[in-house]
């Protein structure tokens, strides 16, 4: 969408140079349907994750703190998804006013940064728990995890401020519709470039490199352990899990990041071809569905890597209430790996346990 604006009587009015870009009947049907599916699956799955971690597992490990906050961040975003479904079904007509436009937009931005930051911290925590369990015991505490989550929520909130400030309801004169959109003044290119690069670098590139590095080091440590024990099948299983985690993150977000960058170029007028604008505006909601659907599945995905989480989850589905007394647990769990390659060389004869337990 290429926008030109004017102000009359204090009302922001916009001329869209490519009024038909991204406006296809199949988009107006398919995207609201996908949003509805994401909403139902996400609310159901993440609510169960919160119940399992908080009431059944009693929130006793560092990893469970991160997963709980991940599920809560997803729920905050999912509550605004019906607004976007209605907006798309009404052919990009925003009927909810300027206030909800800002709140819903900030929620999308907040979820992006909060989820990515939490997944990054979770990967670092897994690295410390598996590769340096003894050295990291003093750092991997519940207090540190909770403070880290508070900092993440504050940073995500800070990163969402541009959506609150610059996202507004505009009236497009040549199509006679009201939209909820970002609009940048053509003479001020610093802001959109800065926001686009922040989203690409801080919201994807740096976290991906940290996640990739953390899980690569985990795999190398486990590979060494399993080679000593001559346990090749187990080594292959761990490699597949780690590859799934890294690729799951990468392919969920890379399409959205690419088209976000192209959208900024269109907004700035660097790209003026309406055919390219149509491709970007058509692809953008599809990439959002891919990114945020996978994002909302993350708590379930990571949780089901642990046997206890899986057991409690199935127990909840059978309406079995949590026990009054909780089990005692070591603070290093989510990895119950008994072989410690960096801290306990003499334990090479021990049999490794599952390495991604939540509790």
UniProtKB/Swiss-Prot annotation:
Localization annotation: Cell membrane
Signal peptide: none
Residues at which angiotensin II binds: 15, 17, 167, 182-184, 199
Topology with respect to the bilayer: Multi-pass membrane protein
Activity control summary: Strongly inhibited by anti-hypertensive drugs losartan, candesartan, valsartan, irbesartan, telmisartan, eprosartan, olmesartan and azilsartan, most of which share a common biphenyl-tetrazole scaffold.
Pfam families from the UniProt entry: 7tm_1
Gene3D superfamilies from the UniProt entry: Rhodopsin 7-helix transmembrane proteins
Tissue localization of expression: Liver, lung, adrenal and adrenocortical adenomas.
Residue spans of biased composition, Polar residues class: 335-350
Gene Ontology MF terms in the entry: angiotensin type I receptor activity; angiotensin type II receptor activity; bradykinin receptor binding; protein heterodimerization activity
Keyword annotations: Cell membrane, Disease variant, Disulfide bond, G-protein coupled receptor, Glycoprotein, Host-virus interaction, Lipoprotein, Membrane, Palmitate, Phosphoprotein, Receptor, Transducer, Transmembrane, Transmembrane helix
Effect of residue 35 to A/F: Abolished binding to angiotensin II; abolished binding to olmesartan inhibitor
Residues bearing glycans: 4, 176, 188
Implicated disorder: Renal tubular dysgenesis: Autosomal recessive severe disorder of renal tubular development characterized by persistent fetal anuria and perinatal death, probably due to pulmonary hypoplasia from early-onset oligohydramnios (the Potter phenotype).
Record family assignment: Belongs to the G-protein coupled receptor 1 family.
Function: Receptor for angiotensin II, a vasoconstricting peptide, which acts as a key regulator of blood pressure and sodium retention by the kidney. The activated receptor in turn couples to G-alpha proteins G(q) (GNAQ, GNA11, GNA14 or GNA15) and thus activates phospholipase C and increases the cytosolic Ca(2+) concentrations, which in turn triggers cellular responses such as stimulation of protein kinase C. (Microbial infection) During SARS coronavirus-2/SARS-CoV-2 infection, it is able to recognize and internalize the complex formed by secreted ACE2 and SARS-CoV-2 spike protein through DNM2/dynamin 2-dependent endocytosis.
Protein name, UniProt field: Type-1 angiotensin II receptor
Gene: AGTR1
